Structure formats: structure tokens, C-alpha cells
Amino acid sequence: MLTAEEKAAVTGFWGKVKVDEVGAEALGRLLVVYPWTQRFFEHFGDLSNADAVMNNPKVKAHGKKVLDSFSNGMKHLDDLKGTFAQLSELHCDKLHVDPENFRLLGNVLVVVLARHHGNEFTPVLQADFQKVVAGVANALAHKYH
């Protein structure tokens, strides 16, 4: 999946990421840009417009939770399927989340990282992160296969 150099680049960069802010924004943007994903979060309260979503404390808290799990995956890049096995089972068997949503969230995460880190998030680093988010999405979709 990733070369040793790519792993070093993404893990080194990840240490600079403000997980709470980036997670909140990434999940919020997912819910705004792809509104059909909101059906999994109806219990979060007001998701009626972009401002409501982006300022919703439950969206922010869950976004941090999502990125905390992603952070754990960053520590286990060689075993993403094992790392995300329980979450894959939960999202497949209990929550019935369309696995395409994992890919969408990964792409939104890359946008948010670029927004937060500007020129430091180089095209090469973006390419490396695209590999990571694809690997995480595949690991989360593993139970579906």
C-alpha cells in the first residue's frame, strides 16, 4: 500500500493535525455535501442547513470520534483490516452504512486537510493521504465482502 517513505510522510504530518477541528469539519462537510448521509445521524438533532450541521455539537463530537479511530489506523498502516475489523462489523451488521460513504468521507477528509494546512499539504502528501483514506475505506468495507 504505502512505501516506507510515504508512511513516514503521512505519520509525521498527522502529528500536526488538530483531530477535533478536522474531524468536526470533515463530518460536517460530509453531511452538507452528501445530504443523504444524514439519515444515519437523525438522532443528532438539527441538521436542517449547513450552519446547523457545522455548529451541531453532536456532529462535532462524532467527527472527533471518527478521527480518533482514523488516528489509531495511522499507527497500524500495515494492518488496517485488523485495526478496523470491529468498526467494519458494526457499520455493516448493525448500522447498515453504505460502504461508499467511507470513500466519500475519506475524500472530504483530504479536502479539509488541504484547507487547514495549505501549502504544507503538498500534492505528493495529498497522493499519499489518498492511499491512506482508500485503505481505511477498504478496511471499513471489508465485512461487506
Curated annotation (Swiss-Prot):
Superkingdom assignment: Eukaryota
Tissue and organ expression note: Red blood cells.
PTM-bearing positions, type S-nitrosocysteine: C92
PROSITE patterns the UniProt entry points to: GLOBIN
Annotated Globin domain residues: 1-145
One MF annotation (Gene Ontology) recorded for this entry: oxygen carrier activity
Signal peptide extent: none
Phosphothreonine: modified positions: T11
N6-acetyllysine: residues bearing it: K58, K81, K143
Assembly, per entry: Heterotetramer of two alpha chains and two beta chains.
Homology family: Belongs to the globin family.
Function: Involved in oxygen transport from the lung to the various peripheral tissues.
Protein's UniProt name: Hemoglobin subunit beta
Lineage: Eukaryota, Metazoa, Chordata, Craniata, Vertebrata
Annotated gene: HBB
